[in-house]
Amino acid sequence: MEPLAANGELENWDALRARKSFPDLLLGNGASLAVWRNFAYFSLFDEAQTTRNRPLSPTELSVFRAMDTNIFEQALGALRNSIRVNAALTINASSPRHRYFAIKEALIHAIRSVHIPWSQMPADTLASINQELSRYRTVYNGNYDLLTYWAELHAPGGFDNIFRGSDATFEPTYTARKGNTTRILYLHGGLHLVKNADGSTRLLNSSESTLLASFAINQLGDIPLFVNESSSEDKLKSIRGSDYLSYCLGQLAQPTEGLCIFGHSLSKQDHHLLHAVQQASPKALAISIYPHNSNFIEQQKSYYQQLFAEHPHIELCFFNSMSHPLGNPGLRVPVPKSDLGATH
């Protein structure tokens, strides 16, 4: 890593891309915030406790406390296993089933309260995102919202769908890249993915307009496969329990010539992603910084330099996030006043 002065200057993305190669892209929450400001919530687990419609009750919260997790996939999976064990032992206990559906319902309402509705998603915004994503070899998405998937579906021809098994199931042995296409890997799952009873991952067979409601409340088998906000150690538990998520994280750790990091802070809650990037050992990292002011830019540069201080061979390049197509202010969709603070 070349020594860099912690100054308040940022490169233009087009100029940076012209002089260096960045075939891969890592997306964080900043990419979603560039489109929909309501994605600024801190924790979906917190949102599920305060949403107006069917929030988590103290009884449901006790399930999370007992498992020492904030991740819905882990709590729902444990309850589903309890239901099956009770059935096998002919134990007549309805509480696990009731708690399962109550948690799932609270989760769905929390997601709907913060996620941009399909009806408000402009086609030209999806087209712009689609066009930029298609320029990369692999897009690693650290977000679980639907923006990237909706953008892919807008014009799917240039993208490589790896859910090739029966019923659109992920098959670890069937992942060879098809042609010169862009592959999108969802590091923390997504709202369009579900975990089957056998632990495998399936792509939901739904249209764009129905995806937000696809994991229906009354279906026991389908557990939404996304890892919501929690500690890095807690996230790794879910990742290691999924062949798809394990594959995605393993791919991020593969060597690459250059990686663009857009809207991702690589905070301690995502230490597993930082470790994978360090292991990939790219020649250069292009890191987006929002140009709030010179002091903020200097702080951000210093922060990332500390993250990679023990990897001096990785060149860090900092660019203005607003100069990147995914940070274009024209992508921002106004949030109706009725949706501002709608979760409380």
Question: Language-model segments: which ranges?
Answer:
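SIR2/sirtuin-family catalytic core signature
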Residues: 1-25, 31-35, 247-344
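Extended, H/D-rich, highly charged conserved domains that either
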Residues: 23, 61-92, 125-240
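Short, flexible loop segments at boundaries between secondary-structure elements
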Residues: 54-60, 169-185, 283-303
